[in-house]
Amino acid sequence: MEIPKLLYIAVIAIGLSGSLTCATPLANPWADPEAEANPEAKAIAEATAEAIAEALAEPEPALPALPLLAFLFSLPAVQHWIEKNWING
């Protein structure tokens, strides 16, 4: 059973946005309308969108690297969840 390429890319995008919001919660452009005017947050969002578009445009032989990237980008979110729920109570 093959896992769709789009699923890996979605995990990477969620991991990127999660690690950004965990590191700097006030720079979350989805929660704070004033943050949309922040050029740094806008540049990060554009770079993420561009990286996803490039990954979707690549041919399928690039697929073996996507599971590793998805795993690596999910680690900050997992670490944040563990710290929040287990360590800090």
Curated annotation (Swiss-Prot):
TM regions (residue ranges): none
Signal peptide start-end: 1-23
Keywords recorded for this protein, A-Z: Amidation, Ion channel impairing toxin, Neurotoxin, Secreted, Signal, Toxin, Voltage-gated sodium channel impairing toxin
Expression (tissue specificity): Expressed by the venom gland.
Maturation-removed propeptide residues: 24-61
Key word Signal present: yes
Record GO terms (molecular function): sodium channel regulator activity; toxin activity
Keyword Secreted: yes
Residues recorded as bearing Asparagine amide in the entry: N88
Disulfide partners: none
Record's subcellular location: Secreted
A GO cellular-component term linked to this record: extracellular region
Family: Belongs to the formicidae venom clade 1 family.
Biological role stated in the UniProt entry: Vertebrate-selective toxin that causes pain by targeting voltage-gated sodium channels.
The protein's name: Myrmicitoxin(1)-Pr2a
